[in-house]
């Protein structure tokens, strides 16, 4: 029967949407019952009235599927719980559900006393039905809205719940808990929608639901397990709340599980509000809201809750009070989620059950459906975790106070409508457990935590037996995870921004990099100092160019600094948008700031600028080069000025001889041609030069003798008057031997000889005189060439050495008409050089001819 009923319950839970309306009425009843402490009178009144309604609703919803299973399980527990309750639920089966609400209504009236006895009785019998009791543990879930799935199971736990009620009875709050069972009215509303069985189940139904609950319990435990962790926290609040939520039903039912699962969800989820009703109506509301939610995610967890509920039932009674405050806090998030959960279950089951749910779906159908959607809900919550967190926060604030005082009345209706209205929030079903963790953490955290909470729920489902002990750790864990998600959540949101920020920061970084490049360009400007080096060579221009590069550096540095500032300013701006991650961007900004600082430093140092120039900004360097070129051109302009100053020194020479430079150059040419007719000798001289290079290699050792010969020639002029002939002989003798050799160096010697002579003359006479001499010499040479060659050439053929020097010297003395020894010596040297040149040229020709012959025979020289 039970299995069969379970399938139908599936459709019934779907009808959960109908439950919302039923919830409204029962909620009012529940609020009086659960809140009995304050509105005890209204509770008494309304409970009586609602019981009929509950009865009517319950039979419609729960009666059909749940009755048989409930009767089976309930018979045993009912005996222990209370004969009236057992009798009523068992016979009605389908309708008994409605009657149990009536009995329940009575119980609410005598909530404290009647409930406590049933609880005491039930706990013992319930032990055998623990499986259903887990469902009761689900009622805690139902508090969250998941329990509804375990509605009937919760009923059995409700029997266990009475034990909790004693604890509640002991404490004023406990009494409210007992009232919560009395809240059966509330349950009735819930039951009417989906958990009608739960109402009676708590007191009367408990016997009947156990069978049905057992089946769903197995499924529900999963949800319960997740809830259990949260319950640990929430459980405390239920007691403190003294709300129907505390409704020991959950706590008592699975004292541990119920408090854990129910408390968190009861106080946490609207379930507490409606869940409070749910606990009482654990079977009722759970079917509608909690059942759908709990069923989907938490059905597996319920099983563990069952065992726990039995074991920790007593403990739970004590425990709930401690967590009492937390459930309230948690309740807000749970409240929001509970409706959503209900809606989830509704969404899942609604299509098939929509019409049937109105009557039957709540009790057994809910139980049956709960297992199936439970898993689905579990999955969904993870997906829609984001949406869930938002809803819980909104509902959370009101549900807590309302749950405490009027939770059944106000919250239940709103919760149920959302359940029916918003089937989509099904995901919230999972979230309901998660919301407890959010209670400890901010709502946003809840959103993040929700997915994580779901995993926690899965773990409880894995170890249902361990759920009690694991529940507490899990509870702590969800908050921890919640806190972690909190931290994670902000980063998650921020990361997207930080990503953009990082991009911006990167852009900013790049921009600062560009400024450094400009800085390097500034360094390049400093490097441009090379123009300064040129200026140093120039001496005076150095000063003007130095300021010019400074200006360039300043100008470049100013734009660079501005650019760096502009870049750095945008960098902080980009960094500012993300407060958290702005740090990275500020750091980047700092880097560019430091870059401009080095800029001034490289200016003085040239080495550093040279390095950065090639490194980062060749383009900038080019620009800097252009800028530098400008000062360079300026320095060049100054250079001509300096040259103008040097010309001043030349001007000193100009007054003496304006044409001197030209003439001096001419004398050089003349010196080369002095020996013989310039026109004729020039061409051979070129040839001789080329040949001389070759001959020089062979005649290197012979070069030395000509040097002393030359020295002798220089000495000869000193003894001009004495033996000119002797000099001629000496000169002729060595000339003959080394002529070929000397001819090789004849030209270099020629250039050297005048140089040596010039310093001598310079020592004796001023430069002007030397210039004049250079001028005079050519004339003398010309004269000698004209006179001597024509007349003496034949003499040379006979005895060139003897006649030529004498003839030359005599005319020089005649022409000079001076007694200046220096001039005479110079004339003599020039004459001797001319003779040597003539002889050497002739001999060079001979040597060249010989060399050509040798080359023809031996080939080109290879001694190089």
UniProtKB/Swiss-Prot annotation:
Please give the name of this protein. Calphotin
Q: This protein's superkingdom?
A: Eukaryota
Instruction: Give the UniProt record's GO annotations in the biological process aspect.
Output: rhabdomere development; sequestering of calcium ion; visual perception
Cytoplasm as a keyword of this entry, yes or no, is: yes
Q: Which UniProt keywords apply?
A: Calcium, Cytoplasm, Sensory transduction, Vision
Q: In which tissues is it expressed?
A: Soma and axons of photoreceptor cells of compound eyes and ocelli.
Q: What is known about its subunit structure?
A: Homodimer.
Q: Which residues cross the membrane?
A: none
Q: Which gene encodes it?
A: Cpn
Q: What is the purpose of this protein?
A: Plays important roles in both rhabdomere development and in photoreceptor cell survival. Might function as a calcium-sequestering 'sponge' to regulate the amount of free cytoplasmic calcium. It binds 0.3 mole of Ca(2+) per mole of protein.
A cellular component term, taken from the record's GO annotations: axon
Q: Which organism is it from?
A: Drosophila melanogaster
Chief location: cytoplasm
Q: Where in the cell is it found?
A: Cytoplasm
- Look up keyword Transmembrane and say if it applies: no
The terms under GO molecular function for this entry are: calcium ion binding
Q: Give the residue ranges for region: Leucine-zipper.
A: 816-858
């Amino acid at each position: 029967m039970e299995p069969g009923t379970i399938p139908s319950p599936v459709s019934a839970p779907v009808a959960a949407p109908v439950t919302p309306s039923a919830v409204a009425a029962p909620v009012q009843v529940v609020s009086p019952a659960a809140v009995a402490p304050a509105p005890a009178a209204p509770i008494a009144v309304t409970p009586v009235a609602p019981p009929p309604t509950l009865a009517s609703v319950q039979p419609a919803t729960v009666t059909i599927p749940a009755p048989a299973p409930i009767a089976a399980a309930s018979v045993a527990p009912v005996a222990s719980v209370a004969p009236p309750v057992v009798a009523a639920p068992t016979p009605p089966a389908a309708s008994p559900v409605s009657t149990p609400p009536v009995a329940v209504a009575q119980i609410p009236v005598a909530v404290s006393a009647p409930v406590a006895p049933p609880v005491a009785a039930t706990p013992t019998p319930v032990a055998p039905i623990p499986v259903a009791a887990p469902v009761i543990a689900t009622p805690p879930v139902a508090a969250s809205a998941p329990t509804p799935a375990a509605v009937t199971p919760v009923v059995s736990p409700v029997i266990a719940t009475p034990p909790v009620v004693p604890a509640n009875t002991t404490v004023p709050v406990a009494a409210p808990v007992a009232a919560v069972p009395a809240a059966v009215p509330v349950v009735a509303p819930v039951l009417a929608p989906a958990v009608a069985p739960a109402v009676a189940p708590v007191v009367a139904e408990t016997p009947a639901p156990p069978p049905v609950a057992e089946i769903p319990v197995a499924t529900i435990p999963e949800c319960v397990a997740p809830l259990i962790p949260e319950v640990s926290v929430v459980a405390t609040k239920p007691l403190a709340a003294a709300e129907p939520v505390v409704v020991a039903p959950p706590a008592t039912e699975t004292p541990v599980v119920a408090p854990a699962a129910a408390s968190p969800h009861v106080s946490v989820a609207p379930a507490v509000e409606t869940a409070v009703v749910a606990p009482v109506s654990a079977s009722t509301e759970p079917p509608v809201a909690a059942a759908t939610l709990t069923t989907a995610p938490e059905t597996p967890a319920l099983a563990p809750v069952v065992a726990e509920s039995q074991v920790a039932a007593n403990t739970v009674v004590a425990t709930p009070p401690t967590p009492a405050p937390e459930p309230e806090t948690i309740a807000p998030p749970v409240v929001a989620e509970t409706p959503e959960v209900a809606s989830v279950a509704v969404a899942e089951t609604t299509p098939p059950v929509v019409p049937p749910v109105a009557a039957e779906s709540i009790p057994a159908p809910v139980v049956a459906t709960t297992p199936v959607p439970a898993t689905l809900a579990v999955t969904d919550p993870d997906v829609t975790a984001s949406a869930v967190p938002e809803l819980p926060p909104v509902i959370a604030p009101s549900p807590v106070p309302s749950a405490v005082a009027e939770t059944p009345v106000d919250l239940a209706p709103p919760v149920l409508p959302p359940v029916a209205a918003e089937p989509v929030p099904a995901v919230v079903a999972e979230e309901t457990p998660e919301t407890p963790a959010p209670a400890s953490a901010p709502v946003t955290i809840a959103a993040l935590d929700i997915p994580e909470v779901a995993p926690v729920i899965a773990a409880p489902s894995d170890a249902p037996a361990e759920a009690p002990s694991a529940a507490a750790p899990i509870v702590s864990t969800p908050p921890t995870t919640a806190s972690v998600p909190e931290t994670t959540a902000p980063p998650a949101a921020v990361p997207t921004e930080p990503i953009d920020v990082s991009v911006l920061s990167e852009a900013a970084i790049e921009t600062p990099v560009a400024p450094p490049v400009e800085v390097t360009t500034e360094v390049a400007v400093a490097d441009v100092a090379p123009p300064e080096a040129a200026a140093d060579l120039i001496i005076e221009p150095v000063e003007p160019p130095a300021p010019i590069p400074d200006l360039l550096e300043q100008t470049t540095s100013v734009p660079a600094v501005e650019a760096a500032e502009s870049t750095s300013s945008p960098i902080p701006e980009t960094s500012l948008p993300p407060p958290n991650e702005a740090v990275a961007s500020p750091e980047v900004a700092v880097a560019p700031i430091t870059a401009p600082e080095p800029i001034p430093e490289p200016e003085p140092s040239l080495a550093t600028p040279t390095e950065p120039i090639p490194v980062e900004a060749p383009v900038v360097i080019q620009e800097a080069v252009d800028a530098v070129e400008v000062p360079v051109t300026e320095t060049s302009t100054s250079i001509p000025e300096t040259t103008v100053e040097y010309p001043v020194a030349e001007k000193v020479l100009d007054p003496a001889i304006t044409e001197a430079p030209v003439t001096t150059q001419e004398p050089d040419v003349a010196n080369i041609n002095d020996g013989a007719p310039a026109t004729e000798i020039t061409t051979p001289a070129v040839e001789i030069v080329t040949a001389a290079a070759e001959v020089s290699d062979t005649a290197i050792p012979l070069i030395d003798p000509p040097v002393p010969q030359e020295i002798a020639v220089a000495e000869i002029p000193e003894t001009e008057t004495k033996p000119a002939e002797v000099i001629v002989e000496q000169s002729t003798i060595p000339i003959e031997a080394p002529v070929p050799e000397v001819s090789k160096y004849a030209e270099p010697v020629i250039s050297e000889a005048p140089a040596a002579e010039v310093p001598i003359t310079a020592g004796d006479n001023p430069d002007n005189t030397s210039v004049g001499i250079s001028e005079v010499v050519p004339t003398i040479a010309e004269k000698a060439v004209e006179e001597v060659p024509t007349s003496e050439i034949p003499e040379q053929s006979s005895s060139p050495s003897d006649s030529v020097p004498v003839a030359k010297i005599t005319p020089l003395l005649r022409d000079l008409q001076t007694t200046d020894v220096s001039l005479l010596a110079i004339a003599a040297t020039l004459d001797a050089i001319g003779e040597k040149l003539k002889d050497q040229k002739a001999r060079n020709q001979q040597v060249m001819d010989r060399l050509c012959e040798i080359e023809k025979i031996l080939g080109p020289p290879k001694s190089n």
